[in-house]
């Protein structure tokens, strides 16, 4: 983002959004497999519609997993336990149609070598990581607060304080930037699925007072801030009944809310041999440590790969003029301190663990979950000393 005055908007969605239901099922299946077989190859795709879940993709594993039960358990945990909500975990149909990974891909990824770190990338592609000093977790403010809003909606729904809330919700936050810094919230949009008997005036008041205002620190919400709550006037039909959900349809919500480019590859349902996921996590790890080291206020990292080749084709750093040393010098430090080969990333971030279901809602980045190794800033001191 350029250093001037502008408005910038990001959105998030709740765990009950149909695309996020699909993401969470895909990652729950990945975790169930990894619990038994951490060397499995998994590309688990999910479609969910009214009363129907379809599981497809490619899985090569020695694990014995009840995929149908994993899907039902995930839907129940999200809160879809009544047909009136759009899908019911007890009665929905679950169809399973998994194949094995293509041997043509496997020969490049699993190629035996004296140096096992030379495992090839599972596909070609480009990935981005980003960090900035706008929030405590070094994330852009609009997406960070958009996540907070739908997390609070879920919290108030689950603990019964607002019992008329239902699982599906979306948020959108527009910040006003002055000299490249977020100074106030211009507009908040929050749409939440609700019980049919609750009035729109009651929804409007509760959402503003109990969800929106507590999600922001003092000073960001001003008398000028505009609130748009359920702008269509009614949101009873939601979840997979309102829209068909698909894995990988919320890649900007999953990352930085549009604050930096996206390579196009989704995360959920993919084991870490897929650089779409693992290299994007590594790029975030790199960018966050660069900012934490004080080498820049903003840092964007691009990496790219060729299928079957271990070394990244490029590692490019862009600090948008905020770096205290040249971007090329930061990129050189990155190459010296981070192993961005696919297997190097897996080892560096300890990715062969059943940790992925947590990532599938409320963002893969900017969260202080102990399993999220890519959020650590343990390399910051090394980078600072080397600079």
UniProtKB/Swiss-Prot annotation:
GO molecular function: ATP binding; magnesium ion binding; methionine adenosyltransferase activity
Region (Flexible loop): 101-111
Predominant localisation class: cytoplasm
Keyword Lipid metabolism belongs to the record: no
Xref: PROSITE patterns: ADOMET_SYNTHASE_1, ADOMET_SYNTHASE_2
Residues the record lists as binding Mg(2+): 19
Residues annotated to bind ATP: 17, 168-170, 234-235, 243, 249-250, 266, 270
InterPro entries in the record: ADOMET_SYNTHASE_CS, S-AdoMet_synt_C, S-AdoMet_synt_central, S-AdoMet_synt_N, S-AdoMet_synthetase, S-AdoMet_synthetase_sfam
GO annotation, biological process: one-carbon metabolic process; S-adenosylmethionine biosynthetic process
Pfam families associated with the record: S-AdoMet_synt_C, S-AdoMet_synt_M, S-AdoMet_synt_N
Residues engaged in binding K(+): 45
Keyword line: ATP-binding, Cytoplasm, Magnesium, Metal-binding, Nucleotide-binding, One-carbon metabolism, Potassium, Transferase
Catalytic activity, EC: 2.5.1.6
GO cellular component, one term: cytoplasm
Pathway: Amino-acid biosynthesis; S-adenosyl-L-methionine biosynthesis; S-adenosyl-L-methionine from L-methionine: step 1/1
Binding site residues for L-methionine: 58, 101, 243, 274
Reaction catalyzed: L-methionine + ATP + H2O = S-adenosyl-L-methionine + phosphate + diphosphate
Compartments, record wording: Cytoplasm
CDD domains: S-AdoMet_synt
Cofactor note: Binds 2 divalent ions per subunit.
Function: Catalyzes the formation of S-adenosylmethionine (AdoMet) from methionine and ATP. The overall synthetic reaction is composed of two sequential steps, AdoMet formation and the subsequent tripolyphosphate hydrolysis which occurs prior to release of AdoMet from the enzyme.
Subunit structure, interactors included: Homotetramer; dimer of dimers.
HAMAP family: S_AdoMet_synth1
Family: Belongs to the AdoMet synthase family.
Official protein name in the record: S-adenosylmethionine synthase
Native source species: Bordetella petrii (strain ATCC BAA-461 / DSM 12804 / CCUG 43448)
């Amino acid at each position: 983002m350029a250093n001037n005055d502008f408005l910038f908007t990001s959105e998030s969605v709740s765990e009950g959004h149909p695309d996020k239901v699909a993401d969470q099922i895909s990652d729950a299946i990945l975790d169930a497999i990894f619990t038994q077989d951490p060397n499995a190859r998994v590309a688990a795709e999910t479609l969910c519609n009214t009363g129907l879940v379809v599981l497809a993709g490619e899985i090569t594993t020695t694990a014995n997993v009840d995929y149908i039960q994993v899907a039902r358990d995930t839907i129940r945990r999200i809160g879809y336990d009544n047909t009136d909500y759009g899908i019911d975990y007890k009665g929905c149909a679950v169809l399973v149609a998994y194949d094995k990974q293509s041997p043509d891909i496997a020969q490049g990824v699993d190629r035996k070598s004296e140096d096992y770190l030379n495992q090839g990338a599972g596909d070609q592609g480009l990935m981005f990581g980003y960090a900035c000093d706008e929030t405590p977790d070094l994330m852009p403010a609009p997406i960070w607060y958009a996540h907070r809003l739908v997390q609070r909606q879920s919290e108030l729904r689950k603990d019964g304080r607002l019992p008329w809330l239902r699982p599906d919700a979306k948020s959108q936050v527009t910040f006003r930037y002055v000299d490249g810094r977020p100074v106030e919230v211009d507009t908040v949009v929050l749409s939440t699925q609700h019980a049919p008997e609750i009035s729109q005036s009651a929804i409007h008041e509760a959402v503003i007072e109990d969800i929106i205002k507590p999600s922001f620190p003092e000073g960001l919400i001003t008398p000028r801030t505009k609130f748009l709550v359920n702008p269509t006037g009614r949101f009873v039909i939601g979840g997979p009944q309102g829209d068909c959900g698909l894995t990988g349809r919320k890649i900007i919500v999953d990352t930085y809310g549009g604050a930096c480019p996206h390579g196009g590859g989704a995360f959920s349902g993919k084991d870490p041999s897929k650089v779409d996921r693992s290299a994007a996590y590594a790029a975030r790890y790199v960018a966050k440590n660069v900012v934490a080291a004080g080498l820049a206020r903003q840092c964007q990292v691009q990496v790219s790969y060729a299928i079957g080749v271990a070394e990244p084709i490029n590692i490019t750093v862009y600090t948008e003029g905020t770096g205290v040393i040249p971007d090329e010098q930061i990129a050189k430090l990155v190459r010296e301190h981070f192993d961005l080969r696919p297997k190097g990333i897996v080892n560096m971030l300890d990715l062969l663990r059943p940790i992925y279901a947590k990532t599938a809602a409320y963002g893969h980045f900017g969260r202080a979950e102990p399993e999220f190794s890519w959020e650590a800033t343990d390399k910051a001191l090394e980078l600072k000393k080397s600079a």
